[in-house]
C-alpha cells in the first residue's frame, strides 16, 4: 500500500531582515548553527506539497542544498520570501526553474515600505518578480497580509499581479508564537471586509477556476476577521505538519504557544508521527478554538472537503451570469448583525485572538534566547547578513 503523502512546511530559519509591523519574528532570531540541517531534511516523509518559509529563507546561504534534498521528497515546492535577496533568488531559480516563489508585498510602494520596514522593499520585491518572469519562471506570485493600513491597496495590487500573469495570495492578521505577536487585530472590520468583497467579485468574474476557489478562501478571511468559527474543519497534525528550525515538528504555526509532536533531529519520522506526544497534540487540535484561516491549513481542507467550497463556487458563478457583483459580505450573518447593531465592536474584539496582556512565547531554543541577552534580534541579523556579504 502506497504511503500517504503529506502537506509540509519547513521553517528553515527564524532570522529575518524585514521589520514588519504585524510580525515580531525579526526580534527573535534562531542561531544559525542550530538551524535545521540536511540530515534532518532527509528524514522527512513523502509530501505532495512543501512550503519553505522563515524568517527569511534566503538568509540561509545553503538554501540550494535544502531545496535539492526536498525535491527528492516533494511533488511541489514553493518558497515564501520578502524578495530582498534578488541575486540569491535568481541564482536558485536558474537551477530549479520548476519551484514556486511567493514574494510578500503588502500594498503599493509607500504602504508596503511602511508595513515591512525594508528600505526600498517594494522596488526590490517587484524587480525580483519581474526578473523571475523574464527568466521564464511560471510559478511566481505576490503574497499580501491584509490589514487596516493596506486594505485599500488590495484590489489595485491584485490587478497589478493579474496584468503580470502572476499568482496572488492573501492572508490577514493572526496572533501566535510563530509571529511573536498577540496584539494583532483588525480595527475597521467593515472597511477591510469591503475591500475583500471587491477582490472576491473580481476573482469570481475571471475565467480561472483556481481564482474562483481563491474567492472562497477570501470569503473565509472575512468570516475569520469577524471572529467566527472556521468554514471548514482543521486537520492540521493529521495530514499536514510544520517543522521549525530546531527540528521540532508541530501541527501548524497558529497556536498561542509552540505545540511539539516530536523532534526529527533525534527521532525517525514514523516513530515521531505515531508517538504519544503526537497524539496528545492531535487531541489539542481537535479542541482548538483559534479558528485560524491561513492557506497552510485551509488549502488541504478545501481539497479534502471539496464539496463545500465547490457548492459555494457554483452558486456564485451562477449569480455572476446575471450581475457584476455576485458576492456580498452580508451573506455572512455576522456582517449583517454588526451592520444592524445586533453585535458590537467590543463583542467582536473579544472573539479575536488579540490578547493585550499576553506574554508571547517566541518558540526559541535556550541558546537562541540567550543571545538576546546581549544584543537585539535586529543587531544579530544585521551583523550576520553583513558578514555574509563580506564573504
Enumerate the predicted regions with their spans:
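Residues immediately within or flanking Cys/His clusters that coordinate Zn2+
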Residues: 13, 17, 231, 285, ...
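Flexible mid-to-C-terminal extensions adjoining Fe-S/redox cofactors in radical SAM and related proteins
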Residues: 2-4, 253-391
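Conserved alpha-helical substructure of the radical SAM core
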Residues: 1-98, 177, 350, 361-362
Amino acid at each position: 500500500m502506497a504511503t500517504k503523502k503529506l502537506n509540509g512546511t519547513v521553517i528553515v530559519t527564524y532570522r529575518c531582515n524585514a521589520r514588519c509591523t504585524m510580525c515580531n519574528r525579526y526580534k527573535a532570531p534562531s542561531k544559525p548553527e542550530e538551524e535545521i540541517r540536511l540530515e534532518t531534511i532527509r528524514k522527512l516523509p513523502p509530501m505532495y506539497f512543501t512550503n519553505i518559509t522563515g524568517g527569511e529563507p534566503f538568509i540561509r546561504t545553503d538554501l540550494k542544498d535544502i531545496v535539492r534534498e526536498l525535491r527528492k521528497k516533494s511533488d511541489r515546492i514553493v518558497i515564501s520570501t520578502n524578495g530582498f535577496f534578488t541575486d540569491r533568488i535568481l541564482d536558485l531559480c536558474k537551477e530549479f526553474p520548476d519551484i514556486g516563489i511567493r514574494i510578500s508585498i503588502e500594498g503599493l510602494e509607500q504602504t508596503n515600505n511602511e508595513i515591512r520596514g525594508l528600505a526600498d522593499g517594494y522596488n526590490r520585491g517587484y524587480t525580483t518578480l519581474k526578473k523571475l518572469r523574464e527568466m521564464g519562471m511560471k510559478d511566481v506570485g505576490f503574497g499580501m497580509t491584509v490589514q487596516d493600513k493596506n486594505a485599500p491597496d488590495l484590489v489595485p495590487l491584485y490587478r497589478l499581479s493579474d496584468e503580470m500573469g502572476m499568482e496572488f495570495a492573501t492572508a490577514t492578521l493572526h496572533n501566535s508564537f510563530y509571529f511573536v505577536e498577540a496584539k494583532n487585530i483588525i480595527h475597521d472590520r467593515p472597511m477591510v471586509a469591503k475591500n475583500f468583497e471587491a477582490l472576491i467579485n473580481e476573482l469570481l468574474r475571471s475565467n480561472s477556476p483556481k481564482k474562483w476557489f481563491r474567492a472562497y478562501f477570501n470569503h473565509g478571511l472575512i468570516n475569520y476577521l469577524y471572529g467566527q468559527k472556521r468554514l471548514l474543519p482543521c486537520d492540521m497534525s493529521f495530514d499536514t505538519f510544520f517543522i521549525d528550525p530546531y527540528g521540532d515538528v508541530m501541527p501548524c504555526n497558529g497556536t498561542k504557544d509552540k505545540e511539539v509532536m516530536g523532534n526529527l533531529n533525534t527521532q525517525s519520522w514514523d516513530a515521531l508521527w505515531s508517538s504519544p506526544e503526537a497524539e496528545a497534540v492531535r487531541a489539542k487540535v481537535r479542541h482548538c478554538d483559534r479558528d485560524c484561516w491561513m492557506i497552510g491549513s485551509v488549502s488541504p481542507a478545501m481539497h479534502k472537503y471539496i464539496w463545500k467550497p465547490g457548492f459555494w463556487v457554483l452558486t456564485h458563478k451562477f449569480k455572476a451570469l446575471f450581475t457584476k457583483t455576485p458576492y456580498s459580505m452580508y451573506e455572512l450573518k455576522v456582517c449583517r448583525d454588526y451592520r444592524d447593531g445586533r453585535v458590537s465592536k467590543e463583542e467582536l474584539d473579544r472573539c479575536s485572538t488579540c490578547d493585550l496582556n499576553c506574554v508571547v512565547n517566541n518558540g526559541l531554543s535556550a541558546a537562541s534566547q540567550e543571545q538576546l541577552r546581549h544584543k537585539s534580534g535586529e543587531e544579530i541579523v544585521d551583523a550576520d547578513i553583513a558578514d555574509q556579504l563580506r564573504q
